Amino acid sequence: MTLLTMTIDHMLVLAATNRRRLAFVVNQLSGALRRGRPWSRPLRERVLIACTALRTNLTVRELAAIFQISKSTAHRIVATLTPRLAALARTAARPDRRWSWIVDGTLIPTRDHVHAAKSKNYRYSCNAQVLVRRRDLHVIAISAGGPGNRNDPVHYRGSQIQVLCKHHGRVLADGGYRGISELVTPVFRGCRIVRDAVWRRHRRRRARVEHAIGRLKNWRVLRDHRRRGHNLADTLGAVALLHNLSVTLRDNP
């Protein structure tokens, strides 16, 4: 029993989670009945394997060696649970208009070059739009855009994030989103930003989204996405769910 407890604890550390977050995810996923051949590992351990893959970005061979399973089993677990975690994040999303939001874009390096392009980081990347709540860095929505060599407004327009921002009314953004009416951006005069007290206050508040993106990229899968490009949206949703769980359970012990 002691050896089993130590093993679970080591798995939790590797997945950067704790028993409470793991129990929450398992309870949410255990309600849906699944047909087909039963899994050789329980749901709790499969969730740990999927979280470890997102957090560490280990290869299938390395995951199989750590959890003592076959490579095909490790691949099936990650490929099956990642979309379910992303769907759980979309179900749990509850926009709150009491607090201001912040939107920004970031680059996700990808190995699949079909939907990616060389961008300012000199790597093939895809653009991801992130919408967070300024108060606690809770991710309201996250979307996978197109090639990373295009500006943020190109990916923002027509996305679900734009629909949410139009209904909110208090969304901060940087100067790259200039001209979008529903966003609060710095004031320009003569093609230059007016660096006054309003701009300094806006800069301090908008910097919170950079902190949120940095925390999201603690999950190393967003630093080098090795899966197919069409799986990037599910990966982003799963990471957003795990990030929001850490924020929610931290504020409500």
Q: Where in the sequence are the language-model features?
A:
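Short, well-ordered secondary-structure "scaffold" segments embedded in the functional core
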Residues: 42, 46, 62-253
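Short, amphipathic alpha-helical "recognition" segments used to contact nucleic acids or chromatin
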Residues: 42-57
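Short secondary-structure transition/capping motifs
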Residues: 14, 38-39, 52, 66-70
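Glycine-/proline-rich flexible loop or hinge segments
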Residues: 32-34, 57-64
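Basic, low-complexity segments
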Residues: 1-40, 124, 181, 247-252
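Terminal low-complexity, poorly structured segments
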Residues: 8-10, 59, 160
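Short coil/turn linker and secondary-structure boundary residues
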Residues: 6, 17-20, 58, 69, ...
